Amino acid sequence: MTERLQKVTGIVLKETTLNENDKIVQVLSKELGVIKIYAKGAMRLKNKFHSSIGIFTYSDFVVYKPANSDLYQLNEASVKHIFHGLSENIDFLSLAMYMSELTVEVTVPNDKNNDILRLFLNTLHIMTSKRWNVDMCKAAFEMRLMADIGFMPNIVGCCHCGRYEAETFYFIISKGEMYCQNCFHTAAELPQDVIKLKMPSVMALRYFILADMEQMFSFDLAKPYQLPVFKICEEYVLKQTGRFYNTLNFFKD
C-alpha cells in the first residue's frame, strides 16, 4: 500500500448498502469534516468492522485515500461509543436521522469543523440521557448549527435600538432579526414570517447560540415559552438552507 494511512475519529451519519457485503458510510470526523468511507465486507455480521461503522456509532477509523478517488478506504476501525438509547425510542432515532441529514446538507466535505461534531455528540448524549425533551434538543441543535456555519441570527438585542430586555420581542424569520415592541412597527413592514417572543423564549435562543457548548443544555424553559422557540428554530433552518428534509417529516409524524 503506497497511500498514507490516517486516523480519524467521528460518528457515522449515513450508510449506503452497495451489495450484500459492502457499504459506504458518511462520517462526521474531527480531523476531516464529513467524509465518505468505503467499507469492504462490513455488511457481514462476522466482519471485524461491522459494529464499528454502524449508523450513529462513534468510532476511531484508520483510512487511506487512493489517488483520483472521492472515497476513503477503511483499513481499521474500533468503537468509542454507541448511543444505545437511540434504538429504544422512535423519537430519538428520527431526530438523529434529521440531524444527520441536516449536517450532511450544510457541511462542506473534507472541511474540518470540530464544533459541529461536538454539537452532534452532545445533543445525542443529552437526548438519550433524557435530560431534555426531544423538541428542546432539536431546537438547540438547529439554532446552534446555523450559528456554527455562519448564519447566526441577530438575537442579542433589538436590531433598531439595541435594547437587550423588553416585555415582548418580534423575530423575523427571513431576516434573522429581532425587534423590541417599541421599534417593531417602525423598523419593519409587518412581514408574514414574524414570531412574537417573551423574554424567557428570547433568553433560550440566546443560550442556544451564545453559551459554551457544555452550558447550552443546562437550563429549563417553561412549556408556555417553548413553542415559539421550536417554531423559530425549525423555520429558520428551512429558510437558510432553502429546502425541506424528508427526515423532518418522519420526525414530525
At which residue positions do the language-model features occur?
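Non-catalytic alpha-helical scaffolds and adjoining flexible linkers that form interface surfaces
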Residues: M1-I24, L28-D253
